[in-house]
Regions:
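Structural/interface elements that position substrates and couple domains in central-metabolism enzymes
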Residues: 2-557
């Protein structure tokens, strides 16, 4: 069997892609299941896309019950059978989550719905759409950046979403509700998705209007993964009164809207814009802190303490330290979708956007400062960064998840490699880092961040270190990049002992308190941190005490 006929899970298990004969039997099986579930009073819901949002959303819908505790939905999750993602359907049908997270409820809810309630199945055949009463679309709409630090040169990648909408329109019953949860460029539901569906409906001889709606996720992978979908406020809208009524009813049935009420807007463009503005606001606050992070480093200020002091004021309680880069699927790109839509969907030629693209550009390049700190720390120890062995702790874009999309850590690895360092990586939530292992094709051919750096070819061989302590042996520098719980609990004495010698240590995300900083310095390490300008003050105190002790010893005191 050829390699491209197999999908390999993160654990290395191989799953042959389905044959033509299997497609036929698969749909017959689903049709029988759906008929049985519909007869028992359940609504048939198809979730398209089983990624970081779709897999958990499918489980949340499948877990929904009425007031008497009886299941009300039967969910079919659809994931296209590519070599990269087909394994997701196989694992999910075993009751195993295809996404890895700190939240134990992710595994529990999927296992419960697949094995106990039997309200959730996964498939690879798009014919499942023929059975749907509701379709939830969780397909990526990416924003492709043509240059580093200039978001304006990029464009929205609508092809996958447009193809999915077309496939949905070709298969669904006319009265099925189609709910787009994907973060899209404002105007997409009404001016892109609706015309596609309307045209295909006409070809099918369907006279009724497509029932299209939009509702965006506020998903936060991590310790409250499931709750961020099920137990959180949601915004929705429909393309017409019927769609608006249907989407409101559906979300009220599957989410805990009694405690977290829906906000129902008049048009999908308002819901779409709300998501873009919401995330652009967050990105702008983080970008604003980048310059103050540099100010703090150069003037003896601990930005962490400054932020904690500011957060006491209720109006500023959401200010946070920006970390080594603003990653995840949303913040690095969403503002770009709005800028792009203004010109390419709505046809305006003037330039009204100033702050939104600037914030993205600042955030995209912030992570390049971390390798400079590594270089400077090594230099202070009399070592060049070229040929230095560097261990990066944390590859994900945030704590307690295994999501590496637009992670600042990726940029750190690429820049350190360009500077000649030999980089090793550990992350407790990852088995593979596809941005490196498949950098010729991921996220798509010719669009890897590798194209912005030199010396990137060897990074195809980068593999996640399984044993963190073994990876520390003989290391020249350690970069603390992500606030995983494992790294927050690291003991300086054990770390230095495992390394076998003092090393350069760079804290990118305020993992170290003053006590740990002091201990690493006492053990002979050179410590630097993004926004942690007070470290020099701690070091000077230690050096002064050592000098004083030597002086006393010299004069016999």
């Amino acid at each position: 069997m050829q390699k491209n006929q197999v999908s390999i899970s993160p654990s290395g298990e191989e799953f042959p892609l389905p044959t033509r004969e299997e497609y036929q039997t698969e749909f017959a099986h689903l049709k029988a299941l759906a008929a049985k579930q519909r007869k028992s009073g359940k609504q048939i819901v198809v979730v398209v896309g089983l990624g970081f949002v779709g897999a958990v959303m499918a489980a949340v819908v499948a877990d929904a019950t009425d007031k008497k505790g009886r299941p009300t939905k039967f969910v079919i999750g659809v994931q296209r059978p590519s070599t990269r993602s087909f394994w997701k359907t196989r694992l999910l049908n075993r009751g195993v989550s295809p996404v890895k997270a700190e939240d134990p409820e992710v595994e529990r809810i999927i296992l419960r719905c697949v094995k106990e309630k039997q309200t959730l199945v996964a498939t690879y055949t798009e014919e499942a759409l023929k059975l749907a009463e509701v379709v939830v679309v969780d397909v990526q709409c990416d924003y492709l950046k043509e240059s580093l630090g200039d978001v304006r040169t990029g464009s929205a990648e609508m092809a996958a979403l447009e193809a999915s909408i077309a496939t949905i329109a070709e298969n669904i019953p006319p009265r099925a509700l189609v709910l787009i949860e994907t973060t899209v460029a404002p105007g997409t539901t009404e001016q892109v998705a609706y015309p596609i569906m309307k045209k295909i409906f006409k070809k099918r001889g369907i006279q009724s209007e497509p029932l299209l709606a939009h509702s965006y996720e506020r998903v936060m992978p991590g310790k409250a993964y499931v709750a961020s979908i099920r137990d959180f406020w949601r915004v929705c809208s429909g393309i017409n009164p019927t769609a608006r009524k249907r989407v409101t009813q559906f979300l009220n049935e599957v989410l805990h809207t009694d405690k977290y009420p829906l906000t129902v807007l008049d048009r999908p463009i308002e819901s779409e814009t709300a998501k873009i503005v919401e995330n652009s606001y967050r990105a702008t606050i983080l970008a604003f802190l980048d310059e103050w992070s540099l100010f703090a480093e150069r003037n003896g200020v601990d930005l962490k303490k400054v932020i904690e002091a500011i957060k006491v004021r209720p109006t500023h309680s959401n200010i946070i330290f920006p970390g080594p880069g603003i990653g995840g699927y949303c913040l690095p790109k969403d503002g770009g979708l709005g800028v792009w839509a203004y010109r390419h969907i709505f046809g305006f030629e003037d330039d009204i956007f100033k702050i939104t693209p600037l914030a993205i550009d600042i955030n995209d390049t912030r992570c390049l400062h971390a390798p400079q700190l590594v270089r400077d720390a090594l230099r202070n120890m009399g070592k060049p960064i070229a040929s230095a062995e560097v261990l990066l702790l944390g590859a994900a874009y945030r704590e307690d998840v295994g999501d590496t999309r637009y992670s600042g850590s990726e940029m750190i690895v690429r820049k350190l490699t360009e500077m000649g360092a030999d980089v090793k990586v550990h992350d407790p939530y990852l088995d593979h880092w596809w941005e490196f292992e498949a950098q010729d094709t991921y996220p798509r051919p010719d669009y890897s961040w590798a194209r912005f750096f030199h010396r990137q070819e060897p990074l195809k061989n980068l593999r996640i270190e399984k044993d963190m302590w073994a990876a520390m042996k003989g290391i020249d520098a350690v970069v603390l990049a992500v606030r995983h719980d494992l790294y927050l609990k690291l003991d300086p004495d054990r770390v230095v002992k495992s390394a076998g010698r003092p090393f350069a240590l760079v804290d990118c995300f305020c993992l170290l308190d003053d006590e740990k900083i002091r201990r690493y310095l006492q053990l002979g390490c050179e410590v630097k941190g993004m926004g942690r300008g007070h470290i020099k003050r701690i070091k000077d105190t230690i050096d002064n005490r050592r000098s004083g002790a030597k002086a006393k010893s010299r004069f016999g005191h």
